[in-house]
Amino acid sequence: MVIGCGGVASVAVHKCCQNSGVFTELMIASRTKSKCDALKAQLEGKTDTVITTAQVDADKVEELEALIRSYKPDAVLNVALPYQDLTIMEACLRTGVDYIDTANYEAENTDDPQWRAIYEKRCKEKGFTAYFDYSWQWDLNDRFKEAGLTALLGSGFDPGVTSVFSAYALKHYFDEIHTIDILDCNGGDHGYPFATNFNPEINLREVSANGSYWENGHWVETKPMEIKREYNFPQVGEKDMYLLHHEEIESLAKNVPGVKRIRFFMTFGQSYLTHMKCLENVGMLSTSPIQFQGQEIVPIQFLKALLPDPASLGPRTVGKTNIGCIFN
């Protein structure tokens, strides 16, 4: 069962359907069933996978639980919003189904007093201020173990493949790894003045936040885009890349013994950065609700409605990406 039907979900479903021998049956479930139906229609006649669709509100554990019990999947792939990780994990625990996701939990309402108290305590203890971290999901580890279930977190490319690269390098090439630099270069061009490659709300919150890296057992935090490097990426060329906080730093620091420093860099063009800074300066990246003409809206969610749908970018994008790790 795939929960979510955005850009990442579309890619995941297409890849599953290219492997029909493994994924013989597949349900796509999302808040908007028409999007699931449209994705199913794209694949009709192109795959042997039997696809069904359903509507579900991933914020509601009871709805998720009922749908999972009805369909009885072997595993749930969560490619919805990171805000919904905990509700989907809870539904998997209640139904005895394995869980997979691509991004760690992040709170939607960062002004919620209960969440804020836990968040501020974590900031003091860990030393970074990102709104997303693994602690919320790692707290469920014992429950998944006791139920005999697997929860595979961060199973995209970064995090995901980059973590596999790191584990493989440690097992086969190095006695010790002292430093890991993860480099993510998007050399593609979609032709728009400004767009994001995945959910704009998540993407812009991540990029506009403080950066951080792991060094000598501690977190070191930086201002947004403070650390810039140039790198000549194979098949892409020279690009500017910037240090960001990214979730696999947290998991690699925990699981790579003896590592002294872990950093994450991502490339951005000047047009992207200029647009983002302008939007931030006028308050459009805010997650706090405001009143507008008698209605409550969240600025960054309103912005999301104006920007191109990430799921529409694939057919019009040309170029290459280059993602990998540098070990010492």
Each language-model region and where it sits:
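N-terminal Rossmann-fold NAD(P) dinucleotide-binding loop
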Residues: A9-V13
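Helix N-cap at the beta1-alpha1 junction of Rossmann-like dinucleotide-binding domains, i.e.
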Residues: R31-K35
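Rossmann-fold cofactor-recognition segment
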Residues: G45-K60
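C-terminal catalytic/substrate-binding lobe primarily of soluble NAD(P)-dependent oxidoreductases
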Residues: K171-N328
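Conserved N-terminal Rossmann-fold NAD(P)-binding element of oxidoreductases
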Residues: M1-G7
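Glycine-/Pro-rich loop/turn segments that contact NAD(P) or position catalytic residues
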Residues: P82-F198
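Conserved Rossmann-fold cofactor-binding substructure of NAD(P)-dependent oxidoreductases
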Residues: V56-P73, A80, Q84
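Short beta-strand element of Class I
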Residues: E25-M27
